[in-house]
Regions:
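Alpha/beta enzyme core
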Residues: 2-33, 38-46, 51-245, 249-308
Length: 308
């Protein structure tokens, strides 16, 4: 399958958008070798369990190493050209995961472009089913910020209900749940604990409108990231599952998120608001390099402690 994007007239950019084989998607279509009805049923069940287990391990691997980098195209972004550019940038720039709107056609497009684990975001649990069938390997209840301008807020009880419903529909798929910044830090920590009990695999933080900086430059970048860094610090000490720090992060503040206790970071507007795929790749690369440098720093510190 090939993809042509009309706005990408540069030969180098068209080459960057070349389809990629996705081994996870190929594995989701098991070969049935038995002929009897019972054997076929057993084969499907066994194969499905094995695939889900191995897929979840792939999705969670970078979180366990505290180096997950998820690039987010946006909950309400159904622009195939923009999503393709963002995903290509994530793939070529060194990200470990991509996060797109929960739409089966978008998922099929992204499956053709990258072998990275694909996360779909929604606040409608029933919408996840078709997306997972299309090739998504991770689902997320979150990206509430797109609703805030209209005054729509999500309560802890509502988020817990959405989590329970999602787990009922998809008991074995990797599940990430965002804790809204509209709650106080103690309330965020409490909700995270309850989400962990309900089977969430990852907790994601957010910064929201309160992260708009009043200063420029590095000071502004630090100010913008403060709410989500504070949430990552607080929540990571309340739960045992990985925490993903998202909202308002940059190459300057990504290392701080890991230091605060996050197992990974999620970045959206710093990438998806750019209008050139090459610029997007450069931005993702700077984020990946910042994460790598933090990992090297942690290793050096561990060696120093052992030497002392």
């Amino acid at each position: 399958m090939s993809l042509h994007i009309a706005t990408m007239s540069s030969p180098s950019q068209e080459l960057l958008l070349k389809p990629t084989f996705n081994p996870l998607y190929a594995a989701s279509k098991p070969l049935l070798t038995h002929t009897t009805k019972n054997h076929v049923s057993l084969s499907r069940t066994t194969t499905t369990r094995a695939i889900l287990s191995s897929t979840k391990e792939v999705v969670m691997k970078e979180f366990r190493h505290h180096r997950a980098l998820k690039i987010i195209s946006g909950l309400h972004n159904f622009d195939k050209e923009n999503v393709a550019s963002v995903v290509t940038a994530a793939d070529k720039g060194g990200a470990t995961h991509v996060d797109i709107a929960c739409d089966p056609e978008l998922v099929k497009l992204v499956v053709s472009l990258t072998s990275l684990p694909i996360c779909v975001s929604s606040v409608d649990p029933s919408a996840f089913l078709a997306a997972v069938e299309a090739g998504a390997t991770m689902v997320e209840i979150g990206n509430y910020d797109s609703f805030y301008d209209s005054g729509r807020l999500f309560s802890p009880d509502e988020i817990l209900l959405l989590t329970k419903e999602t787990r009922r529909f998809l008991p074995n798929v990797t599940l990430s749940v965002t804790v809204p910044h509209t709650l106080s830090l103690p309330e965020q920590a409490k909700l995270a604990e309850l989400l962990q009990e309900e089977g969430a695999d990852i907790i994601q933080t957010e910064g929201g409108k309160c992260s708009n900086p009043s200063k420029a430059g590095v000071l502004g970048l630090l100010e913008k990231a403060t709410p989500t860094l504070a949430a990552a610090y607080t929540i990571s000490r309340a739960v045992k599952i990985p925490v993903m720090c998202a909202s308002g992060l940059s190459a300057v503040t990504v290392p701080l998120a890991i230091t605060a206790g996050a197992a990974g970071v999620g970045v959206g507007s710093a990438v998806n608001k750019l209008n050139d795929v090459v610029a997007m790749i450069a931005q993702v690369r700077s984020l990946a390099d910042a994460l790598a440098s933090q990992k090297e720093t942690n290793v050096d510190q561990e060696k120093t402690v052992k030497w002392l």
